[in-house]
Amino acid sequence: MYPASPPAGPALHPVPHRARLPQPRCLAEPPRSPAPGPGSTARPPPPPAPGPRPRVAVKMTFRKAYSIKDKLQAIERVKGGERQASVCRDFGVPGGTLRGWLKDEPKLRWFLDQLGGEVGTQRKKMRLANEEEIDRAVYSWFLTLRQHGVPLSGPVIQAQAEAFARQIYGPECTFKASHGWFWRWQKRHGISSQRIYGEAESPVAGPAPVKEEPAQSPGAVLVPDGAPATLPHSEGGYGDEQIYNANVTGLYWRLLPEQASTPGTGDSKEPGGCSRRWRSDRVTVLLAANLTGSHKLKPLVIGQLPDPPSLRHHNQDKFPASYRYSPDAWLSRPLLRGWFFEEFVPGVKRYLRRSCLQQKAVLLVAHPPCPSWATSMPPLEESEETPRQCQPELLGSPEELQTPDGAVRVLFLSKGTSRAHIPAPLEHGVVAAFKHLYKRELLRLAVSCASGSPLDFMRSFVLKDMLYLAGLSWDLVQAGSIERCWLLGLRAAFEPGQQPAHQVEETAEHSRVLSDLTHLAALAYKRLAPEEVAQWLHLDDDGGLPEGCREEVAPAAPPSPASLPSSIGAGEEEEEATEQGGVLVPTAGEAVWGLETALRWLESQDPREVGPLRLVQLRSLITMARRLGGIGPSAVTSDDGV
């Protein structure tokens, strides 16, 4: 028997066992869709599988370091009203960087003040020396010797730096002026080595032994970058904003038209036409500005009071004008020198740094003018009676009035009487405009205090108010007027026959100020003639009196309160008037005490918000209350010599 056969079908063969290998997903083919039938629409192909995108080569941008000059230029453009987006686009910086510059502006200004010079504006990092005192001492010593033509080399400067270190920190100081310190000192102050052929001056002492460094060529000395080897005094090359002019003028700072028109008794009138009793109220004002009028320095007021009561316990740096004392109220040589180094040089350097200009300037100063009655005297050789003290004294030489590096200096204009005479630019209308504006504001104050007598106003108007009034009047002088006066003054040296430009505008402005003065004088003094107002305006046009040409005249004593008219008596009449209609009326002493308390509070506030008008009005009320009540003067309402 045979076994049963399997069912019909494919033959089954044994398959050997194999391990199943996992197939990669990337090789797996997507399932195919069935072929579309005759009545179906075609479907779009599926999107590509997600995967890594191809890399694109990106060029890296390098960060750019901006100098302090660039940062300050951007800051000035934003402060000038330009949009920050436009400034960022021009400089190629994001908005956050520009806002950071604006935030760091005080630090940038402080760094320039510490470093100084044109080199400081080119710095990109605000880093000072580790030993700042030694660095400053060496740099000042270097500038002083280079001004006198003394050649200096690296080893000499290094030895002097170590000597300064021992003087500052004591003999135990371990400071060493290495070659690295000297290299950093050169780069910090912009000093390079140059070969000098012939110095301007020989050294005062014997020639110091000079030992050259290997890096320096034989005969090379150190000079500041951009400066000639001999530092000549007439190097020129100044821009319009770097040329300044200063001029002095006399001013009766609280003299009103009524007092000026009152004739003096006997020979109590000085040649200018004013009574001698008001000579103590005469001050000298120094005005200075650059050619464009964009920088006007604070006026300098010189008076005869050594310690004015109204200026005590006050920070005079906040005043719009400065005050200095002189026995005869004239600009002497020490005063001019002190003003030049204490106010002019720091103010000009701050302005030049703010404007991103080179740190150099020149100040043109006219010789002190003499009144017509003094200049008409015969010279000393022809008249032995002319005192020597009436001869005008020179205020100094250009060598004395200049900075150690010679960047800021003074030049005196010619004083000849022929064509060689160069008039001061500010004499052509600027000084007269300042005085007319000052007297207009003075009359406005007098009209506002018309409730009291003129003596009440003069006692209430103190020297502190005068400084504010002088600063206000100087600010009212337009920059365009100053620039036109410069052109008019300098044209005399080149085109003496040509007419001044913009004469119509100047005449219209002058006429408007004179019209205001005449109107205010008519309001304050109804019986005053226009000729008397004109005399009051031109009373101090002589420009001031030079040294020694004044007589020592003591200020007039103020009238006693008993001699002044009073409508309210003291004693029993005041007690009878204390009660009127059941309302308690304060006494004169209580009223004066309350007004003085209010005055002390008002003076403690910000002077720019208060202004001189309210202070003068309140002092006028106090003076009137004291006069009506028969009370003597007090220390609160100081009269500054009235």
Swiss-Prot record:
Residues 57-108 form the HTH psq-type domain. Residues 1-54, 202-238, 375-400, 548-581 are annotated as: Disordered. It is found in: Nucleus. The keyword DNA-binding applies. Keywords: DNA-binding, Nucleus. Residues 84-104, 155-188 bind DNA. GO terms for cellular component: nucleus. GO terms for molecular function: DNA binding. Residues 122-195 form the HTH CENPB-type domain. Residues 31-53 have a biased composition (Pro residues). Its main location: nucleus. The keyword Glycoprotein does not apply. InterPro entries: CenT-Element_Derived (IPR050863), DDE_SF_endonuclease_dom (IPR004875), Homeodomain-like_sf (IPR009057), HTH_CenpB_DNA-bd_dom (IPR006600), HTH_Psq (IPR007889), WH-like_DNA-bd_sf (IPR036388). SUPFAM superfamilies: Homeodomain-like. Residues 240-365 form the DDE-1 domain. Belongs to the tigger transposable element derived protein family. This is Tigger transposable element derived 5.
